[in-house]
A protein has these predicted regions:
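Intrinsically disordered, low-complexity regulatory regions enriched in serine/threonine/proline
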Residues: 1-9, 28, 35-150
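Amphipathic alpha-helical segments
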Residues: 7-28
Length: 150
């Protein structure tokens, strides 16, 4: 049986991420959202902390840019239908995008679900989606990688 905190976590994922991402063609699988574009894919991963427990859940948002040609060079086998964030060419956390240290969202018995849902939706709309918009083609990815290496 799930604890109140686990139920809150499920609600926060369902109401915080899905309503914003589904209309933008993101598909959900487990704690991952993936959107495939013509040349690249965008991934949002919800990573639970291994230090939490059933009554205190901590998680953060990881972001990835998946590029099929890069994946083919470094992996064998069929291209994944739902790639995961660790195999992405470019990987970031919400911390990187917000310019903060180690941000983990926390859920416990006293968490205000609606407040946390609002914060997550703002982070998606203000930081994650603009980041994805900057990296929606192979050309833009190559320019970003070149810029980061300088």
């Amino acid at each position: 049986m799930k604890t109140d905190t686990q139920i809150k976590f499920d609600t926060i994922v369902k109401e915080g991420f899905t309503p914003v991402l589904k209309p933008l063609s993101f598909k959900k699988k487990a704690l991952n959202y993936y959107r495939r574009l013509a040349e690249v894919g965008h991934i949002i991963n919800i990573q639970k902390s291994s230090y939490g427990d059933r009554d205190n859940i901590r998680f953060r948002i990881n972001i990835g840019i998946f590029e099929p040609k890069f994946w083919s060079v470094s992996h064998t086998g069929q291209l994944p239908d739902y790639p995961t964030e660790p195999v992405c060419l470019i990987r970031k956390t919400i911390n990187d995008l917000r310019g903060r240290k180690d941000l983990w969202y926390e859920i416990h018995n006293y968490t205000d679900e609606q407040k946390l849902i609002k914060e997550i939706q703002e982070d998606i709309q203000q930081y994650i989606l603009p980041f994805f918009d900057q990296l929606d083609s192979v050309e833009k990815i190559l320019l970003a990688l070149e810029k980061d290496s300088n």
